[in-house]
Amino acid sequence: MGSLNVSIVTPDGPVYEGVAQMVIARTKAGELGILPGHVPLVAPLKIDIVRLKVESGEEWVAVNGGFMEVNGEEVNILADTAEREQDIDIDRAEKAKQRAEEELSRAKEQKVDEVMARLALQRAINRIHAKEHN
């Protein structure tokens, strides 16, 4: 089986550069598994985990939106934000989740921006999920 050159980049810089045998990402249309030789595509990403099948096992990256471009043996992910599992501070992520849940509760009571509170909660849960996958 061949391999893919994978790049995950945010506005703050590169998060992951490496080789993978498979990339699994959740797009707006559903989950996609990308193998070498995949048809070229561009797809918007949801807030979720990007799983990279590598020789040593699997690496998880918490991605908070963006786009994935597949072209030949190249997979480029341009993410709003992204963190590798080993870079996630679980205490900070848990606190962010708690703040987002409180904000969501207030949003429902006070009719303030519920959408922003839901997005903050999704991002926090996504980071926790990435960190705890092992």
Curated annotation (Swiss-Prot):
Cellular component aspect of the GO annotation: plasma membrane; proton-transporting ATP synthase complex
Keywords, ordered alphabetically: ATP synthesis, Cell membrane, CF(1), Hydrogen ion transport, Ion transport, Membrane, Transport
Domain of life (superkingdom): Bacteria
Keyword Membrane among record annotations: yes
Membrane-topology annotation of the record: Peripheral membrane protein
Compartments in which it is found: Cell membrane
Main location: membrane
GO molecular function terms attached to this record: ATP binding; proton-transporting ATP synthase activity, rotational mechanism
InterPro entries with a match to the protein in the record: ATP_F1_dsu/esu_C_sf, ATP_synth_F1_dsu/esu, ATP_synth_F1_dsu/esu_N, ATP_synth_F1_esu_C, ATPsynth_dsu/esu_N
Pfam families noted in UniProt: ATP-synt_DE (PF00401), ATP-synt_DE_N (PF02823)
Its biological purpose: Produces ATP from ADP in the presence of a proton gradient across the membrane.
Family: Belongs to the ATPase epsilon chain family.
Subunit structure as annotated in this protein's UniProt entry: F-type ATPases have 2 components, CF(1) - the catalytic core - and CF(0) - the membrane proton channel. CF(1) has five subunits: alpha(3), beta(3), gamma(1), delta(1), epsilon(1). CF(0) has three main subunits: a, b and c.
Protein's UniProt name: ATP synthase epsilon chain
Source organism: Listeria innocua serovar 6a (strain ATCC BAA-680 / CLIP 11262)
Gene name tied to this protein: atpC
